[in-house]
């Protein structure tokens, strides 16, 4: 049975692939994605890498988001304690766990990973900013000393920057790291990568959980297919088992297929745009406020997402643990947006905006067109720049980009 997963909360999206022949024999699970991996280092990967890496690597703890209590469950750590002041955390590590390269997982490996990740100033390295020291107390005991209280149990469960990987990485060339050869402990191992085409993972025979169940796959193929129509056809024809980012408008068509299941889950994802605060004209706070006031979230949810989302009440999704709504969210109001333009001190001719968006998503395209229309109504000149996620991700990290 093929699966289509919809994330009800202005979903971002994941992946699926196509093009060459697929040996769909029951032992191969085929996923379709809209773009490729850009960083194979588990220390700094911060984008679509999460799909293959969540099968290749594991954290110390997992956060169970299936219920409202958001329980922490054991990963590579079996138990943990913290001091009353929240500054000292002790983790008991799982025994008899090996990395894909044969290295033994232990406290020294944890220390190596955290120390290495902290040394970078990119990706999710910031999650370790409150960790002052990591001590390997014993083979399977590790202590984290913080400089101020932080929810370290949540931090070590992060989907970015918290994967445990082999200390043998220190002896690897940068080229080997860049090609996906850093070993993890996960159920699947890296096998091959054809850039912009396919990633293949194979079963880890030494996986610590074992493979006693009969319902598993020998191979995972993650294929890159930029066109949503092609991803849809792959699901319909049985060439793909799992797909994300199928346009909402086509879901009813898929629901009629006996071999396809369409499921909906609340997501910890908000749909938002990044504004460059270092470059004209979005370095002007009143221009930024005008853009925010011209963003019609209700209309976008209703007509673009078919009410599959909820209007966000802040930058962070409201269903994340300990969420508190900020009081600074600007409501949609075109008249107020025009007033912000006047307060900016700039004429309409001085305000030219480029909007980059992911062209492989029909929802992103329609959202951007809605924004384009509203910006025109308040006198802002806008140029649309569609492109692949990987290209837009690089733009988002470039100070020269405006939006």
Question: Each predicted region: which residue ranges?
Answer:
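Periplasmic binding protein-like
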Residues: 31, 102, 376-403
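N-terminal lobe/hinge region of extracytoplasmic solute-binding protein
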Residues: 32-84, 115, 181-183
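Aromatic- and charge-enriched surface segment that lines or borders ligand/interaction sites
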Residues: 78-123, 137, 143, 234, ...
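Surface-exposed binding/hinge segments that line
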Residues: 22, 92, 126-170, 192-194
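Ligand-site clamp/hinge motif
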Residues: 206-253, 381-383
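Gly/Pro-rich hinge or "lid" segments in bacterial periplasmic/extracellular proteins
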Residues: 64-67, 158-215, 219-221, 227-229, ...
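A structural "hinge/loop" feature
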Residues: 35-51, 76, 103, 149, ...
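Append "and occasionally in soluble cytosolic enzymes with long acidic Gly/Pro-rich linkers
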Residues: 203, 263, 283-373, 377-378, ...
